[in-house]
From Swiss-Prot:
Disulfide bonds join C62-C87. Residues 70-143 form the PA domain. The keyword Transport applies. Residues 185-318 are cytoplasmic. This is Receptor homology region, transmembrane domain- and RING domain-containing protein 5. Involved in the trafficking of vacuolar proteins. May function as a sorting receptor for protein trafficking to the protein storage vacuole (PSV). Glycans are attached at N121. Pfam families: PA, zf-RING_2. The lineage of its organism: Eukaryota, Viridiplantae, Streptophyta, Embryophyta, Tracheophyta.
Amino acid sequence: MNYSWITIMSLLVICKLASAKVVLIGKNTILSFDDVEATFTPIVRNSGECGILYVAEPLEACSDITNMAEKRSKYRSSYVLIVLGGCSFEEKVRKAQKAGYKAAIVYNDGYDELLVPMAGNSSGVDIHGLLVTRASGEVLKGYADQDEMKLWLIPGFGISSWSIMGITFISLLAMSAILATCFVVRRHQIRQSVRDLPHGGQGLSCMPRDLLQSMPTEVYSGVLEESSTSVTCAICIDDYCVGEKLRILPCKHKYHAVCIDSWLGRCRSFCPVCKQNPRTGNDVPPASETTPLISPSPNSITSLQSFYDLPIVVRVYL
């Protein structure tokens, strides 16, 4: 029975997905076998190779093989089946090459199902070398020397350490891109919500420099005043030092002048502690130990203010 190329290629695709490299195709017969290629022989081409299987004489092929390979077309080669043992795997491959075969299919002499890639010297080796289990070898032997049985050698999909590293790297890169996208979208939503606040989000516009400079200042003397609530700047989290210039906001909260100037000049025109807008005329009682950190006034930006908007102020003491 003649098989069309479409049927054969379909079978090859199925076998590839099953990771079967040795496929026997004949009349009403399709068998696939797992194998492992030797490390010192040429690898099977991506398109696969087709041939006829013969049993080596002698079977161990530790001496010259007497049944020489028959010359066939370039589309069909001759393969030889050899049993493991008696000599090295490399020697068997070289004997098969000397006899004119294009591939040496060696099967285990024991019933060990573990297939280990065989090593050897690749110098002068031009044919394929494959190792299969003993059970596979016994089945292949029953179909050898039959012209109607085609043996296909198909490359498998091996997973190397580099492949694993590549997949891991791509996965991490994709996750990072997703997280970055979520962060950007969330930040855009917050900014859009701020713009939609009443009065256009008053309190988030930059304070004019002349208004900023008009706010009173004082030189810290080290004496804690009765109305003062802290000896630490709430922006830079540093204690006040004697002689430092402090700026006083209308809400009576004090900060390092350089800190609050940077804060109010970066489109954050509200007190870092009580969130009151220094430009409004709201009468707010002096701060005390019970003063809430977030003011309930309409100009409050509540939770929309993010921690990453705080300025970083570096003071250098000379």
